[in-house]
Amino acid sequence: MEAKESRPQGFPELKNDTFLRAAWGEETDYTPVWCMRQAGRYLPEFRETRAAQDFFSTCRSPEACCELTLQPLRRFPLDAAIIFSDILVVPQALGMEVTMVPGKGPSFPEPLREERDLERLRDPATVASELGYVFQAITLTRQQLAGRVPLIGFAGAPWTLMTYMVEGGGSSTMSQAKRWLYQRPQASHQLLRILTDALVPYLVGQVAAGAQALQLFESHAGHLGPQLFSKFALPYIRDVSKRVKAGLQEAGLAPVPMIIFAKDGHFALEELAQAGYEVVGLDWTVAPEKARERVGKTVTLQGNLDPCALYASEEEIGKLVQQMLNDFGPQRYIANLGHGLYPDMDPEHVGAFVDAVHKHSRLLRQN
């Protein structure tokens, strides 16, 4: 079904739809697997490609993004590709300056400090037209993949994007962003609405360009407790999925599965399972069997091996994967890590993880 439906531009036919079938809740012969940050600095070829230009110049080069997206697939039999890009291209498209400082991470020289700073932001309706380079990268990559596996598009969720725009970069406390929530709730909602209005056409545009699934990253969910999350994050997470689905229908595009990954958002698992996403991503702090009890059979779960488990021996990785697969069960499940791969990880161990998922999930189905 899916392979034919999501070929808006006569792309090559999909040969491996295991990831999409699992996302839709259909039965699969084995458990599909991909890794967050699978296109990353742990690969020497990634570091080599990236050395040619600065980070955001790389993001703006469809050819470079395509090459980086395909690199892990040349090494490992992954069941999905995720486009190489960054969640901060959206604040950039809204007119904010963002630089990537080597060894430090993203930096906003002029973060949002006052309510009136919101006036500096561009009209969110123009954002998708500013991000044509992402759409070009997706189309090129989808063609180059030649139907090998599906291509995932992504974006950051409104609260997570807001934290960067207010904090001016990464933060261990998010105290400036949370100060906004407590001191300027109206302005906070205004900013979150602007971001939602920017994200919807951006995500619809990714599907129009060839993305076959979408993941929304609420990476900073854990900085909010249940109350703040249900007030300032969840309504926008819901709104994104509802409006993207409506936007796809309006554009005459087939529906694609959507994944919500709210890191450290275990306190809102039930709500996330009912937020309009086909897949809920889990970090490693959540016990799989407990998560399954809490969300029921209505959604697919994705995750959630501790990325640091890949520092273990290949034999130990196999045992940990086996345990994880037993805990999640064979169906309505996509294997992944509970967060992205770290730069100092051994590619051989990433391969061991992928192979172990395929091997043990097949054995699990035989028994």
Curated annotation (Swiss-Prot):
InterPro entries for this protein: UROD/MetE-like_sf, Uroporphyrinogen_deCO2ase_HemE, Uroporphyrinogen_deCOase
Binding annotation for coproporphyrinogen III: R37, A39, R41, D86, Y164, S219, H339
Domain of life: Eukaryota
Record-listed coproporphyrinogen I binding positions: R37, A39, R41, R50, D86, Y164, S219, H339
Subcellular location: Cytoplasm, Cytosol
EC numbers, comma separated: 4.1.1.37
GO MF annotations, alphabetized: uroporphyrinogen decarboxylase activity
Residue numbers marked as site, Transition state stabilizer: D86
BP terms from Gene Ontology: porphyrin-containing compound catabolic process; protoporphyrinogen IX biosynthetic process
Modified residues (N-acetylmethionine): M1
Catalytic activity: uroporphyrinogen III + 4 H(+) = coproporphyrinogen III + 4 CO2; uroporphyrinogen I + 4 H(+) = coproporphyrinogen I + 4 CO2
Keywords: Acetylation, Cytoplasm, Decarboxylase, Disease variant, Heme biosynthesis, Lyase, Porphyrin biosynthesis
GO cellular component: cytosol
Pathway(s): Porphyrin-containing compound metabolism; protoporphyrin-IX biosynthesis; coproporphyrinogen-III from 5-aminolevulinate: step 4/4
Class of enzymatic activity (EC top level): lyase
PROSITE patterns, per the entry: UROD_1 (PS00906), UROD_2 (PS00907)
Principal location: cytoplasm
Subunit-structure text: Homodimer.
Disease: Defects in UROD are the cause of porphyria cutanea tarda (PCT). PCT has been identified in a flock of German Blackface sheep. It is characterized by photosensitivity and porphyrinuria.
Protein name per Swiss-Prot or TrEMBL: Uroporphyrinogen decarboxylase
